[in-house]
Amino acid sequence: MIERHHPVVERIRVPLRNLGSAFEGFRVVQISDLHVEPNLNPALLRKAVDMINGLQPDLIAITGDFITHNAKVVADLTAPLADLKSRAGVFASLGNHDVWNAPRRITEALGHHGIRVLTNSGTDLTQGHDQLWIAGIDSAWAGDIDLPSALKGRAKGGPCLLLGHEPDYADEVAQRSSNLLQLAGHTHGGQICLPGGQPLMLPTLGKKYARGLFQVGGISLYVNRGLGTIGPKARFACSPEITEITLSNTSAA
């Protein structure tokens, strides 16, 4: 179906407490679930890279499932990602398919393309006197999550951007943290949906939060519909997605 060849840009605004003025209006562009083999058309990935660069993002986040099964091809098939441009860098977390196959190979290949994979780790992004913690966790389905390690070093009460592939893990994150935006994928938004977007099938750890923006306790969660497909090479009522997220201070939201 031709829908899978035409990504759309979704734009949202997410407030975070204690977000410094230097990060007011900070724009994060997210993609997810590339599944570069066997189903992703290379032309679609190049098109997505061009669309992302056209948005001139401050930061790019990629939330896992770079492959489906064959990690040996990941370096070549993800080569267009080396052309991604953002002011603060490109960060990623791994998905369940990445972890089931060859997480080290994928992490190294992405690093070669200038993409920093965060697995149970984080880093402090500083602009002037203001800080934003960027963190990533392992796959909740296939890996071994260590959320405290991912958040270690974060300023108390400070704003945080967390890359975590499976959206339903947000319930656990919300019990252990707050003032945080989790970016997830995994569900493909359902991939094949009824008119209006009702998913016909959703994966483990993706059944509760299928697509879009949610408030989960004291955190926000955004679930991206992904770029690629798994199983049938088709999408219906569920276009591939590039998300532009603008951060704002709670008091300015």
State where each predicted segment sits.
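N-terminal membrane-anchoring alpha-helices
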Residues: 1-22, 253
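Membrane-embedded segments
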Residues: 5, 20-118
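Active-site metal-binding loops of divalent metal-dependent hydrolases
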Residues: 32-36, 64-66, 96-97, 121-122, ...
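Binuclear metal-dependent hydrolase catalytic cores centered on His/Asp/Glu-rich metal-binding motifs
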Residues: 108-115, 119-121, 127-172, 235-236
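Active-site-proximal beta-strand elements of phosphoester/diester hydrolases
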Residues: 25-35, 131-139, 161-165, 220-225
